[in-house]
Amino acid sequence: MNRCWALFLSLCCYLRLVSAEGDPIPEELYKMLSDHSIRSFDDLQRLLHGDSVDEDRAELDLNSTRSHCGGELESLSRGRRSLGEAAGSPTVAEPAMIAECKTRTEVFEVSRRLIDRTNANFLVWPPCVEVQRCSGCCNNRNVQCRPTQVQLRLVQVRKIEIVRKRPVFKKATVTLEDHLACKCETVVAARPVTRSPGSSQEQRARTPQTRVTIRTVRVRRPPKGKHQKFKHTHDKKALKETLGA
């Protein structure tokens, strides 16, 4: 009985000491005291040592975390210093290599006009695919990288339409063009057409032209006032005599 009271007093002293230091008292201790789960000194020692071990482990973990973070910060600062030194000092440039003429993977956009040119109220999924295309440069500008072997490939995409506020999924087939082989070929430039000054005249002479001639017909009117005084004379004989006189 005296031993139990001694354990109880020692535990109360420990709790007061802990509360005096300012650390919060765990709720498990109050529960263990109320339940009388501490039956011996070994239980109390085990409990105290368990708390101390946990505290030691927590402190150890905190120290290791601090040291680890410090090591990371130090290594990061060293890396930054090395990068700064490399940026400030002249670096050795590697020799440039020509991008040779060969097939490369490119992204091809699947447009809606490849599926339906009469309707634009739909979506295509996927919106883009990968194709093989020739690319690269040649030794001079007179030759270009062009495909020498081409293969057509059929792929199936989804055509998404909205009908009565609901999506309708349909299947559509798209033809893709893949380049299998490439080669630098000579570019044949279109020759400019030169025209001489006489060529336009010859062209005009060869071209039949329709000429429209407009003639003006003048209508002669009798002079006014002539024979005006004889317009009421009906006798031709008298008229001749008068004119002959």
Curated annotation (Swiss-Prot):
Propeptide: 21-81, 195-245
Keywords linked to the UniProt accession: Cleavage on pair of basic residues, Developmental protein, Disulfide bond, Glycoprotein, Growth factor, Mitogen, Proto-oncogene, Secreted, Signal
Pfam families: PDGF, PDGF_N
Segments passing through the bilayer: none
UniProt-listed SMART domains: PDGF (SM00141)
Biased composition (Basic and acidic residues): 236-245
Gene3D superfamilies: Cystine-knot cytokines (2.10.90.10)
Coiled coil (residue ranges): none
Residue stretches of biased makeup (Basic residues): 220-235
Record's keyword annotation contains Disulfide bond: yes
Signal peptide bounds: 1-20
Any one GO biological process: protein phosphorylation
Similarity field: Belongs to the PDGF/VEGF growth factor family.
Function: Growth factor that plays an essential role in the regulation of embryonic development, cell proliferation, cell migration, survival and chemotaxis. Potent mitogen for cells of mesenchymal origin. Required for normal proliferation and recruitment of pericytes and vascular smooth muscle cells in the central nervous system, skin, lung, heart and placenta. Required for normal blood vessel development, and for normal development of kidney glomeruli. Plays an important role in wound healing. Signaling is modulated by the formation of heterodimers with PDGFA.
Protein name: Platelet-derived growth factor subunit B
Species classification: Eukaryota, Metazoa, Chordata, Craniata, Vertebrata
